[in-house]
Amino acid sequence: MRQIIIAGNWKMNTTLSEACTLVQGMKYELDQISGIQKIVCPPFISLAPVKTILDGSSIHLGAQNLFYEEKGAYTGEISPLMLQDICPYVIIGHSERRAYFGETGQVVNRKIKAALQAGIMPIVCVGEKLEENENGQTRQILETQMKEALAGINPSSIIIAYEPIWAIGTGKAATAAEANNTISYIRKVLGDIWGNTASRITPILYGGSVNEKNTAELLCQSDIDGALVGGASLKAESFVSICRQAADVRK
């Protein structure tokens, strides 16, 4: 059985002091929750101090992005080598990176390769826009994104996150059945690329307005292995509640 993973993507939120306060406010409660993987992804400047706070904790740390080169004249970028000793996870290919910073499937692919080379597990994001969903293009878009992201990469330890763009930060989530149906298709595409064994063991998360009210229903679905949580991860009590519900699903 695939382990449930709950990852909190803080995006461009929290100052350094706010990040430390937030993680301190959830650390004790999260450490009481077992049977699931818990990940928090604060902004880059907070990674090191948050890591110190989480030392010895069951909570894992992730970055929100990286660049595909190890070092050099790439002003403002963060390399895999810089993250290697700080966090075991990194989000790659989030729709906001694709939309605001022009990240293509080829760039996402290079970043995944760089993360794996550095021993960092990528959380690879895929998802369709509202108009693509309404035009019946969801499967086509997701298949293209998956094939571009994993081109030339052998079966590896990765996490996939399905985030329908129309549901991110809008309060409008896919129904549990819709999300499960789409994730089942993503798993089929992964099987076509990497084979059935890799498809069966790779965790696929749902993201997009995940909150305390819809978590349990989402995680009861057969193909949904967890959640990539946005806004609700910025409140300690909400994130703890989501993680607690996730653990209860597997009891």
From Swiss-Prot:
The pathway entry for this protein reads as: Carbohydrate biosynthesis; gluconeogenesis; Carbohydrate degradation; glycolysis; D-glyceraldehyde 3-phosphate from glycerone phosphate: step 1/1
A single GO BP = gluconeogenesis
Keyword Magnesium in annotation:
no
| Residues reported in the UniProt entry to bind substrate | N9, W10, K11, G169, S209, G230, G231
The record's catalysed reaction(s) read: D-glyceraldehyde 3-phosphate = dihydroxyacetone phosphate
- For this protein, the Enzyme Commission number is 5.3.1.1
Q: Name one GO molecular function term.
A: triose-phosphate isomerase activity
Q: Which residues does the entry assign to the active site, renumbered to this chain? A: H94 (electrophile), E163 (proton acceptor)
Q: Which InterPro entries match?
A: Aldolase_TIM, TIM_sf, TrioseP_Isoase_bac/euk, Triosephosphate_isomerase, Triosephosphate_isomerase_AS
Q: Which UniProt keywords apply?
A: Cytoplasm, Gluconeogenesis, Glycolysis, Isomerase
HAMAP family assigned to the protein according to its UniProt record, in alphabetical order: TIM_B
Question: What NCBIfam families is this protein classified in?
Answer: tim
Q: So what does this one do?
A: Involved in the gluconeogenesis. Catalyzes stereospecifically the conversion of dihydroxyacetone phosphate (DHAP) to D-glyceraldehyde-3-phosphate (G3P).
* Name of the protein in its database record: Triosephosphate isomerase
Q: What are the top taxonomic ranks of the organism? A: Bacteria, Bacillati, Chloroflexota, Dehalococcoidia, Dehalococcoidales
By which gene is this protein encoded? tpiA
